[in-house]
Amino acid sequence: MNPQELKSILSHGLLSFPVTDFNAQGDFNQAGYIKRLEWLAPYGASALFAAGGTGEFFSLAASEYSQVIKTAVDTCAKSVPILAGVGGSTRQAIEYAQEAERLGAKGLLLLPHYLTEASQDGVAAHVEAVCKSVNIGVVVYNRNVCRLNADLLEKLAERCPNLIGYKDGLGDIELMVSIRRRLGDRFSYLGGLPTAEVYAAAYKALGVPVYSSAVFNFIPKTAMDFYHAIARDDHATVGKLIDDFFLPYLDIRNRKAGYAVSIVKAGAKIAGYDAGPVRTPLTDLTAEEYEMLAALMDKMGPQ
């Protein structure tokens, strides 16, 4: 799949990022991961991101990363395109990127770099180096320390033909508008704030109708129903699902830092697809929070 074909795929539909399965000892559980992918693939997501942020990329050893990406690519070869998360230092990100390309990933999601502080010129150089190390398409994730503006993204677009996507995890509307207006159809644009459904209608109004869904991991039917309601401007259905599920869900998620991942793994367990514990420094939900989420999911009915 060439980068432009990937860009076309990412410009439509719902995206998601499977959690990574670990066993009780905290090791990668390949059988569980295969079962998860086989469950999720038929629901209709346009693409899946393996070893992304919710897939705990930053907790994976290099050998585990290869296992996760190969398992995802092999399992979903005939059903849904797999993009691989990559990140870390520039040299590490390049190694991961080249490994993902070798294993058959259709594209890459370039996660924020490892530094706590860096100039955006330096961030742009990091992105350029990773893009130029591979031939497959790359989506850059503006989040946390990565805050590329329209000027830098325009330069990167000129230098890196395979940089085909921009995922926004900042929620800076002024920045999003400036990027969308400046770059036009050069990129596919993805909403990437945690629990993106809450912001989906607003982002669609900005010209960003595509987003990645965390809750697709455990209520895939509801996630697709919500996406279709957004697509057809069914404000009544959107509002009801936000009131009945997403706002109470946020109340649980916001209790502790890192719960954006932990709550998804808890949801997967409740749904019957236990992915095991999160790895430190993340922490799992408490028993009380787990029961609160279970009650909330029960209201959404069979998936």
Swiss-Prot record:
This is Probable 5-dehydro-4-deoxyglucarate dehydratase. InterPro entries: Aldolase_TIM, DapA-like, Dehydro-deoxyglucarate_dehyd. It comes from the Bacteria. Keywords: Lyase. GO terms for molecular function: 4-hydroxy-tetrahydrodipicolinate synthase activity; 5-dehydro-4-deoxyglucarate dehydratase activity. Its EC number is 4.2.1.41. It is an enzyme of class 4 (lyase). The keyword Lyase applies. Belongs to the DapA family. It catalyses: 5-dehydro-4-deoxy-D-glucarate + H(+) = 2,5-dioxopentanoate + CO2 + H2O. Pathway: Carbohydrate acid metabolism; D-glucarate degradation; 2,5-dioxopentanoate from D-glucarate: step 2/2. GO terms for biological process: D-glucarate catabolic process. It comes from Pseudomonas putida (strain W619).
